[in-house]
Amino acid sequence: RLISGMVRGIGAEYYSMGMSPAISHERFHEAHDLVIQAWTKEGPFAFEGKHYHFEYVNVWPRPFQNPHPPIWCPSQGSLETIEWAADPDHKYTYLQTYSPFEAVKKFLHMYRDVARDKFGYEAQDSQLGWAAPIYIGETDEKAIEEARPHMEAFFNKFLRMTPEMLLPPGYLSLRSYKNVMKHKGGLSKVRSMED
């Protein structure tokens, strides 16, 4: 048994593979379709897509869950990802990642609004998630004191990227870029995550 997390990746990952970030959505959707077919279609079969070509696809053993394992979509707030996850053909769990609580609430409300207003159904609580760093200490103060240097290193060193590498031109639609900046104000800071 498993829960699958399907992520599009970030702009820098496409650059490192010599690919345009502007095609990240179509590559992601095609890869999703390939994985779903591999999980649900009797093999072997050939897959011929625009970006992926396989003469022989045959997953064995097949997943235990039917029709396939649950899929969660981690995201930083791309409107296209929210709409794709909420689509009635999917109804995948939307997982907001590394965001302050107020931004999480806004993006999860957006998922509910899209499900209701665009697709005509009420999103269930099980379709909404928040991936937040958690550290447990003897007291809240001790936990913050012990965790802060590690979280600061994670956000300020390991995830430190210039905007053009993190969100290069074409990676987000203009409406998603404006939405992320409006609700998150750029990259999350450690202090805003402590609440």
Regions found by a protein language model. Name each.
Residues 11, 52, 78-79, 99-100, ...:
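Short, solvent-exposed loop/turn segments at secondary-structure junctions
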Residues 73-78, 166:
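A general structural motif
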Residues 77-108:
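A conserved active-site cap/scaffold subdomain adjacent to cofactor or substrate pockets
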Residues 66-70:
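A local structural motif
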Residues 7-19:
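Acidic/polar active-site rim loop that often engages polyanionic ligands
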Residues 23-62, 102-195:
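An alpha-helical appendage that flanks or caps ligand/catalytic pockets
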Residues 2-6, 71-74, 90-95, 126-132:
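Hydrophobic faces of well-ordered beta-strands that scaffold small-molecule active sites
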